[in-house]
From Swiss-Prot:
Membrane topology: Multi-pass membrane protein
One Pfam family this sequence matches: Na_H_Exchanger
Record organism: Klebsiella pneumoniae subsp. pneumoniae (strain ATCC 700721 / MGH 78578)
Name of the protein in question: K(+)/H(+) antiporter NhaP2
Gene3D superfamilies, per the entry: 1.20.1530.20, 3.30.465.10, Regulator of K+ conductance, C-terminal domain
């Protein structure tokens, strides 16, 4: 390749990435998932599009996609809170194993019938599209305000279900190549190896990487690169040992994000941009790889297969996978069934048969691409609507427009949060002394019209003021309520109830005030309101959990770890309104 060709590639790549970034701003206005925009640009630049670029380098696409997935999952793992694992680990693992098996089997049998394939080839299609995609889930669920149980289950499922899909795909390809029709006992050994090595190397390598970052003094800009290179190394080593590199790099990121780490915010800020670049590159390359004209002949059976997977296979797998977990109500199960988002992983898995030289490899790839496209367009565009219908969205709180870590020491928890006050903030006009700041938080600076003020307790807040607050991460919910908009008060009342009570209040006293019947056993044992609600829920509580008892609807309004702090209450008849 000469210098002119290299420069041409640079120009082409930069133009495609720039177009993807600029057009991404239209995705929210059009209601189209941003990943579809990236995919469409790749298709337009491809052989059947206006770009006319011939691209069929499957090994290169495989390499780029795996590298991008490693970056996305490393970033996603760092942003997953440990509390999410406490709430959703076992349900998510059930969906990642039992759920993927059921989805793959049901989808595979339908694929064999629709495309007139051997059963084992149909099952291969089912395995290829059997797992949800972490890149799609992290991208599309961000900012939706889902309750913690639902959001965490979907995120952890997407980060941990790829080992099963990868293993099924590789196993079925080997069986087709060797003309086998039955499974051997090695099936179980391989799947244990995938999960076992993924967990062991991910956590072990993540711990070593954490110690390296905290013990070695480097310029601030090198810590993100060290974390990135370490994460990719863990991904590559695990994959080379026939373990799940995807699971390993996700757990590595989770460990880094939930332990004290040097320059944490610098790493996260850099990872945010790198994750976006990885998504753009991955979907552009996968879009270039497909030939749209090849999708037309299979459009009808592929659409029927997509509908079968979305409306039959995924719901059945979710209800079966969540059967042992009574903490999920029917609405939450239905919503999780709907969010079976497919993305880059099925397309990457569809490259495996191409590289193995199977007879129907091109068909497998086109079907997988079509299923992903339908999933993103149908499920991706309707996520917000489905979340509201299923009532799994909790009222939002105000988040800072900027947050910067005070990286004095890896163990230092303090950060600076920046809030800008709009006209709709309830605290406008209030004196600083009247703000009920969380304990140990301080207003470090107040800017008005780009001028730094020296505020006193009598200083009143005005529209447009910018406050810099020193606090810790667990102070964000309280600060968010303090600097929230006025209208959400009514929204809070509709969602949580007319009154929000302290969970430490005795249930007997609350029952007497409201004139409630029932709950004698709770009164006799002098249980608190929070204890009663947790006992009725029967699972680790999350904000937004509701239970109807004694003619009232009790809603978890605030919690810390697994303990309920505030409970909303309203009359049960209001539920129908």
């Amino acid at each position: 390749m000469d210098a002119a060709a290299v420069i041409s590639l640079f120009i082409l790549g930069s133009v495609l990435v720039t177009c993807s970034i600029l057009l991404s701003s239209f995705s929210s206005r059009l209601g189209i998932p941003i990943l579809v925009i990236f995919l469409a640009i790749g298709m337009l630049a491809g052989i059947d599009g206006i770009g006319g670029i011939p691209f069929d380098n499957y090994p290169f696409a495989y390499m780029v996609s795996n590298l991008a997935l490693a970056v996305i999952l490393l970033d996603g793992g760092m942003r997953t809170q440990a509390s999410s694992f406490r709430v959703a680990l076992w349900p998510a693992l059930s969906l990642a194993t039992v759920g993927v098996l059921i989805t793959s089997a049901l989808t595979g049998m339908m694929a064999a019938w629709l495309f007139k394939l051997d059963l084992i080839e149909g099952l291969l299609i089912g395995a290829i599209v059997g797992s949800t995609d972490a890149a799609a889930v992290f991208s599309l669920l961000g900012g939706k305000g889902l309750n913690e149980r639902v959001g965490s289950t979907l995120e952890i499922e997407s980060g941990s279900n790829d080992p099963m899909a990868v293993f099924l795909t590789i196993t079925l390809i080997e069986m087709i190549q060797q003309h086998q029709t039955g499974l051997s006992w090695m099936f179980a050994v391989h799947i244990i190896q995938q999960f076992g090595l993924g967990i062991a190397i991910g956590l072990g390598g993540g711990y070593l990487l954490l110690q390296m970052i905290n013990r070695i003094v480097l310029p601030a800009g090198l810590y993100p690169l060290l974390a990135l290179s370490g994460g990719i190394m863990i991904f590559a080593v695990t994959t080379s040992l026939d373990g799940s590199g995807i699971l390993a790099v996700y757990l590595c990121g989770f460990l880094l994000g939930n332990r004290p780490i040097r320059n944490r915010h610098g790493i996260l800020q850099n990872f945010d941009g790198l994750a976006w670049l990885a998504q753009i590159a991955m979907f552009l390359v996968l879009g270039l790889l497909v030939t749209p004209s090849d999708l037309l002949p299979i459009a009808i059976p592929a659409l029927l297969l997509s509908m079968w997977m979305i409306f039959i296979a995924r719901p059945l797998s979710v209800f079966a996978g969540l059967l042992p977990f009574r903490g999920f109500n029917l609405r939450e199960r239905v919503f999780i069934s709907w969010v079976g988002l497919r993305g880059a992983v099925p397309i990457i898995l569809a490259v495996f048969p191409m590289m193995a030289g199977l007879d129907n490899a091109r068909l497998f790839f086109n079907v997988a691409f079509f299923v992903v496209l339908v999933s993103l367009l149908l499920q991706g565009t309707s996520l917000s609507w489905a979340a509201k219908k299923a009532k799994v969205v909790v009222p939002p709180i105000s988040w800072p427009i900027s947050r910067v870590g005070l990286d004095i020491h890896p163990e230092n928890p303090w950060e600076q949060f920046v809030y800008q006050l709009g006209a709709d903030k309830w605290c406008i006009g209030a004196a600083l002394r009247d703000l009920h700041m969380p304990p140990e938080t301080r207003i470090a600076a107040l800017f008005r019209n780009n001028v730094l003020l020296h505020p006193t307790g009598s200083t009143r807040l005005r529209e447009g003021d910018i406050l810099c607050v020193i606090g810790r991460e667990h102070d964000l919910p309280a600060l968010g309520k303090m600097f929230s908009q006025s209208p959400p008060v009514a929204l809070d009342q509709r969602f949580f109830g007319d009154f929000i009570l302290d969970a430490e209040a005795r249930f007997a006293d609350v029952a007497q005030i409201y004139g409630l019947d029932g709950g004698e056993e709770f009164r006799e044992h002098q249980q608190s309101l929070g204890e009663v609600v947790q006992q009725l829920l029967g699972a680790a509580p999350v904000v937004g959990d509701q239970v109807e008892f004694a003619g009232m609807v009790w809603t978890v309004a605030e919690k810390e770890n697994d303990h309920v702090l505030k409970v909303g209450v309203r009359v049960a008849e209001d539920e129908a309104e």
